[in-house]
Swiss-Prot record:
The lineage of its organism: Bacteria, Pseudomonadati, Pseudomonadota, Alphaproteobacteria, Rhodobacterales. GO terms for cellular component: acetolactate synthase complex. The keyword Chloroplast does not apply. Belongs to the TPP enzyme family. This is Sulfoacetaldehyde acetyltransferase. Pfam families: TPP_enzyme_C, TPP_enzyme_M, TPP_enzyme_N. It is an enzyme of class 2 (transferase). One of its GO terms (molecular function) is acetolactate synthase activity. Its EC number is 2.3.3.15.
């Protein structure tokens, strides 16, 4: 079933190829572009202003792509990334793959070297379609100037349909040509609602379950399905867990909210889902990293019947055995299952289940509030030594508790990849979706700052706060030179400052006998000082009270138009390693001798 909307007049018009391009963007309401200016895109960027499109010129294209990701995730509205052919475009690779695994519909515009010189190894020439083949859900190159609008329309529609980035590749000599074309029609398809037989079986399993658990993934947020899942959970008195890095997939204040699974997530959620006899995995691909053991608990319920709901059939049953697979929109499926439940659904052990949920949540809340420090594995002493070296400094958990005391409930937050941000995974909760912008399963460093800038562009009246470790922040620090200009909105960003690549250092303590290779950062660098040099406000916080006060003031300043970077000085404690499942202690066999090193001979 399909429906049409926003159709242009069905008659040919004479226009330039760049006008056709921009008119198609207008048809789809794409109002924001992120990147760095280049000659190959100037014919279209020249008319952005007339079209109502704002071009946000960042300091590095990779950060620009992550700004686009943050904007679209926070608003639900598509944006685009665009830059100069060749090196400008290849700088987008990490951002595009990040958006792919964040299920973010984005338009990637890649101006190409001119057709007449392609294949000659010319200036800024690279095979851009090949570069992004595994990064996008759909890609197409314009083969003739008269097809400019047709191809662009199709690329945008596929980005929306598959909820992922899609690429249009345009030879630069196709711009500034006059063509006669009809603007294309927009044809949107209704999202699938699931097969009747599968829905009946899912409703039957949930109706008979003694300990049903719902697991909400990104698809719940994208489909606007949180209210529908709340109704279903309340009907069953089923606890609701959230997928890894999707803390905003269910209201934190709801009595059935069990918190996020995965790395440094909610122990309550892990303990509750381990008891499940039926799991409704709603809008999630159940990626393996998100269900790894945590806190020593191998919590995934191996004997439970799994109902997996995803709009992409190829992802159902890919990582976990399922009893029922449903290809459908999370909101539609949740509503239909609710309507199909039996009259006695949820009654089995209802009161006992409610008591277990409340008791488990309460115990975890008390434990989390008392956690001040990180633990060492047997045989290692790094965290003990780190506390002894700086006894007056905050630990990462102390910093997160100080942050929680000042963080507005309505705030949008972004998080970077890394040890200190990951330790904070259990802390933030939200009352609505599109509030938590984590880097996702591609795991890029340098995501936190650009993502929160993009979110603020899309949600100017909402407070935003970004978080990064100091290693990851170093990858995006050059954006401080861009975001202080008058047209850019004010944001607040917190950098956890412990002068180390913490996640890799924890690996070094556990498996490499404290042989720290490439883990130490320069203690002479002041990120707060760099912020000040860029015309922004830079603040250093050394205690919990200072951090709470600094964040509270920064949010007030943000409302008044001032961007603040807070350097939160913390000790060098290290949290749980990311990849305990993938690491093991190496054993020397042949041995390595420095005397075997030879000098290279240069002609």
């Amino acid at each position: 079933m399909l429906f049409r909307a926003s159709q242009p007049e069905d008659k040919p018009m004479k226009m330039t190829t760049e006008e056709a391009f921009v008119k198609t963007l207008q048809m789809h309401g794409i109002q924001h572009a992120f990147g760095i200016i280049g000659s190959a895109m100037m014919p279209i960027s020249d008319i952005f202003g007339k079209a109502g499109i704002t071009f946000w010129d960042c300091a590095h294209e990779g950060s620009g792509g992550m700004m686009a990701d943050g904007y679209t995730r926070a608003t639900g509205k598509m944006s685009m990334m665009i830059a100069q052919n060749g090196p400008g475009i290849t700088n987008f690779v990490t951002a595009v793959k990040t958006a792919y695994w964040n299920h973010t519909p984005l338009l990637l515009v890649t101006p190409q070297a001119a057709n007449k010189t392609m294949g000659q190894g010319g200036f800024q020439e690279v095979e851009q379609m090949a570069a992004f083949k595994d990064m996008v859900c759909y890609q197409e190159e314009v083969r003739d100037p008269t097809r400019m609008a047709e191809v662009l329309n199709r690329v945008i529609l596929n980005a929306k349909r598959y909820s992922a980035p899609a690429q249009i590749n345009v030879p630069r000599d196709y711009f500034t040509q006059v063509i006669d074309i009809e603007l294309p029609k927009i044809v949107d398809f209704e999202r699938p609602s699931g097969g009747e037989e599968a829905l009946d079986e899912a409703a039957k399993l949930l109706s008979e379950a003694k300990f049903p658990v719902i697991l909400n993934g990104a698809g719940v947020i994208l489909a606007g399905a949180i209210p529908a899942t709340a109704e279903l959970a309340e009907r069953l008195d089923a606890p609701v867990c959230c997928g890894y890095q999707h803390n905003d997939a269910f209201p934190g204040s709801h009595p059935l909210h069990a918190g996020p699974l995965g790395y440094n997530g909610s122990k309550a959620g892990m303990e509750l889902i381990s008891k499940a006899d039926v799991v409704l995995a709603l809008g999630t691909r159940l990626n393996p990293f998100s269900t790894l053991p945590g806190y020593g608990i191998d919590y995934w319920p191996k004997d439970a019947k799994i109902i997996q709901v995803d709009v992409k059939p190829e992802r159902i049953g890919l990582t976990k055995p399922v009893a029922v697979g449903i290809v459908g929109d999370a909101k539609k499926v949740a509503k239909t299952i609710l309507a199909k439940l039996s009259d006695t659904a949820g009654d089995a052990d209802r009161e006992e289940r409610k008591a277990t949920i409340a008791k488990t949540k309460s115990a975890w809340a008390q434990e989390l509030s008392s956690m001040d420090h990180e633990q060492d594995d047997p045989g290692t002493t790094w965290n003990e030594r780190a506390r002894g070296a700086k006894p007056d400094w905050m630990s990462p958990r102390m910093a997160w508790r100080a942050i929680q005391a000042a963080l507005p409930k309505e705030a949008i937050i972004s998080s970077d990849i890394g040890n200190n941000c990951a330790i904070g995974n259990a802390y933030p909760s939200f009352e609505e979706g599109r509030k938590y912008l984590a880097p996702g399963l591609f795991g890029p460093c340098g995501y936190g700052l650009p993502a929160v800038v993009g979110a603020k562009i899309g949600c100017p009246d909402t407070p935003v706060v970004g978080f990064s470790g100091d290693g990851a922040f170093g990858i995006a620090v050059n954006e401080l030179t861009a975001i202080g200009r008058g047209e850019w909105p004010a944001v607040t960003h917190v950098v956890f400052r412990n002068y180390q690549w913490g996640a890799e250092k924890r690996n070094s303590t556990l498996w490499f006998d404290d042989n720290f290779v490439g883990t130490e950062l320069d203690e002479q660098v002041s990120y707060a000082g760099i912020a000040k040099a860029c015309g922004l406000k830079g603040v250093v916080a050394r205690t919990m009270d200072e951090l709470t006060d600094a964040l509270d003031q920064a949010i007030k300043d943000q409302k008044a138009g001032t961007t603040t970077l807070i350097e939160a000085m913390i000790n060098q404690e290290l949290g749980e390693p990311f990849r305990r499942d993938a690491m093991k202690k190496p054993v020397a066999v042949a041995g390595i001798d420095p005397a075997d090193m030879r000098e290279q001979q240069v002609d």
